[in-house]
A protein has these predicted regions:
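Terminal accessory/anchoring regions of large secretory-pathway or extracellular enzymes
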Residues: 1-108
Length: 108
């Protein structure tokens, strides 16, 4: 039986995996940086956890969380098939929603 989980990065800065059957990408950034793969590139300006799914030629769904609960915005640049789009994830909420996952549909 083939394992659908592919480990793409596993170091002190970035951990990244992909479910090849579902085409879901999961990336943990322990600091600001860029994850690059031939199919996907993601750059962030702060530590965060994100998932990219439902990728097609026109859009992708991005889910992003701030486990550090910094209440600061996180800048994200997503690049797929030479198309790129930038967004700012707002993490200004406090209390039980501090750092909670945000969902964005990214138009490419």
């Amino acid at each position: 039986k083939e394992n659908a989980i592919e480990i793409l990065s596993n170091n002190a800065k970035i951990q990244a995996v992909r479910n090849t059957k579902l085409n879901v990408w999961m990336v943990t950034f322990f600091e600001a940086g860029t994850f690059k793969h031939k199919e996907l590139s993601v750059t962030v300006d702060k530590p965060c956890v994100l998932m990219v799914k439902d990728i097609n030629s026109k859009s992708a769904n991005l889910h992003i969380a701030d486990p550090g609960q910094t209440q600061s915005p996180i800048q994200v640049e997503l690049k797929i098939d030479k198309k790129k789009q930038a967004l700012t994830a707002d993490f200004s909420q406090t209390g039980i929603y501090a750092g909670a996952t945000k969902q964005y549909t990214v138009k490419l």
